[in-house]
């Protein structure tokens, strides 16, 4: 009797172990994806999340992170995957000075090589150059004969008119942001004329005519929507900011299939997996302006936009 009970208990324990084991196989494929706190990042974060979930992963998405917090999460191993920008990595994370004239391909190669030494694998790039830009209403630029950032710098320095300027708080302090821009173009925004706020607040400020000059990103849909003037970066201050999935080497060692999965995503964008050209980069910016417009102008949710894109490009079933 004791032997029968012991056998029965052993069978129950074995079945329990099998059941738990099966559950662990699914649960073991757990990935944490992080994204920053603006529209484009919400969309790419959802794209990565939904695509990996479709391929059998359990994904936790950690949104709304500032650049330093996202990087800290990657370095601590709390976040496995993010989509970072080449210019941000080169100047902020790797603390290099950008040399004007380094193109999209060169900068990607430099970042990829150095990040490999830090334990991060940079996969195929998405050529969209979401670089910082300064914009104004077209009539303000026309009235003051402004075309380039050099023209704008001269207007600041002349002091004949107040140029109310609105930039993101992070941009106002980061090493590749406003302080370096002012030094490069040799101008200064008076403290009384400078406003800072959360990402997107500068666009709202310009839309409402609360400022004359606002910080934007190259893929912001609202620029085309309102026909705003974008100041030419005639002294080549801003480095390329191309979007690239970055994966922890440790998680890629465990799940090497992630590389092919995310490279499939990059391949759906203009020039994905190929060397960048100005034409391909411009096409990529246009694609992302449209995607961002679906959220910022059509008021769709980022997860809807991501799902729609993945289905339309055959990456997941509808």
Q: Which residue stretches match the model-derived regions?
A:
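Short helices/loops that flank or line small-molecule/ion binding pockets
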Residues: 50-51, 68-80, 95, 179-184, ...
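Beta->alpha turn/N-cap motifs
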Residues: 63-67, 77-90, 107, 199, ...
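Bilobed "Venus flytrap"/periplasmic-binding protein-like clamshell domains
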Residues: 30-64, 127-204, 300
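An extracytoplasmic/periplasmic, membrane-proximal ligand-sensing/linker region
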Residues: 172-176, 180-187, 263-318
